[in-house]
Amino acid sequence: MPPPRTRGAESGGAGPSADLFRQYLREIGRIPLLTAAEEVDLARRVEAGLFAEEKLGGAADLDSQLAVDLDRLVVMGRMAKRRLIESNLRLVVSVAKRYVGRGLTMLDLVQEGNLGLIRAVEKFDYARGYKFSTYATWWIRQAMSRALADQARTIRVPVHVVELINRVVRVQRRMLQERGYEPTAEEVAVHLELTPERVLEVLRLAQEPVSLHAPVGEEDDVALGDLIEDGDAASPVESAAFFLRCEHLEAVLSTLGERERKVVQLRYGLADGRPRTLEEIGRIFGVTRERIRQIESKTLNKLRDHAFADQLRGYLD
């Protein structure tokens, strides 16, 4: 159920376009929300349908009964996809409200966000245990941010520059988290197949206040910094995994001793999003790195025996 494809109308305004949009909001407001179990069931059907569609397209001489079965899976998958999309259209509107006034109308933002939602439905991996809304929000925001750069009439900061800044910053932050120190321009360059000089140039652009405030949209109402989302430090999958890990680990912290709980919080960055090294935690407690490693190992073994063990296994092993 796409919104009216009429450009140039803000939500809450007057005229036919605004009336159509209000009608659209009323219609999607009547669509029941899904339970977590329903989301998983629909996601399974979507995955099966996509698999069946691929099989049908890649095999020339399928058994007739198998072809019928695959056709049925395709139909069921498309029905599930539609329901999963329609049940989350309100999420798109909610995200779109954060971007109003940056160069695109509410109608345009919702239209672009719906494309991101469709992509999220197609890419969603229910087996990982993520909340679909957490995962989909990243794709919706990505679609809207891209649209702001692509569709604004006056773009003085090229879209490819915005995207390159996001790529460099994303890799830089990921390497920082993995290694515990800020990577050099050479290390980032190797990862992105760029020259160190190009990486330094991009980093200078990202760090200069004037450059980050350079106008991107019309009437100078969109700045380059607006298009560098905080979430671009990680992909949708990585971010959803991080939040899921925090959610499940927090659920078992109350079963740990005070020191064990603090070690886990520091090690995984549960309090502030910044994981600490064994050395850093050792300095905080006034003990050796090896002692912290022993505490961590003992604590993780406890967590593996917890009711959430299956969900946590990918993070603790």
Curated annotation (Swiss-Prot):
Pfam family, one: Sigma70_r4
Keyword set includes Cytoplasm: yes
The entry's DNA-binding region: 278-297
Gene3D superfamilies recorded: RNA Polymerase Primary Sigma Factor, Winged helix-like DNA-binding domain superfamily/Winged helix DNA-binding domain
Region ranges (Sigma-70 factor domain-3): 163-239
UniProt KW rRNA processing keyword: no
Compartments where found: Cytoplasm
UniProt keyword terms in alphabetical order: Cytoplasm, DNA-binding, Sigma factor, Transcription, Transcription regulation
Location (main, coarse): cytoplasm
Gene Ontology terms: cellular component: cytoplasm
Region (Sigma-70 factor domain-4): 252-305
Motif Interaction with polymerase core subunit RpoC: positions: 108-111
SUPFAM superfamilies attached to this UniProt entry: Sigma2 domain of RNA polymerase sigma factors (SSF88946), Sigma3 and sigma4 domains of RNA polymerase sigma factors (SSF88659)
GO molecular function annotations of the record: DNA binding; sigma factor activity
Swiss-Prot/TrEMBL GO biological process terms: DNA-templated transcription initiation
Region of interest (Sigma-70 factor domain-2), residue spans: 84-154
Subunit structure: Interacts transiently with the RNA polymerase catalytic core.
Function statement: Sigma factors are initiation factors that promote the attachment of RNA polymerase to specific initiation sites and are then released. This sigma factor is the primary sigma factor during exponential growth.
PANTHER family, A to Z: RNA POLYMERASE PRINCIPAL SIGMA FACTOR HRDA (PTHR30603:SF59), RNA POLYMERASE SIGMA FACTOR RPO (PTHR30603)
Protein family: Belongs to the sigma-70 factor family. RpoD/SigA subfamily.
NCBIfam families hit by this protein: sigma70-ECF
Protein known as: RNA polymerase sigma factor SigA
Organism from which the protein derives: Kitasatospora aureofaciens (Streptomyces aureofaciens)
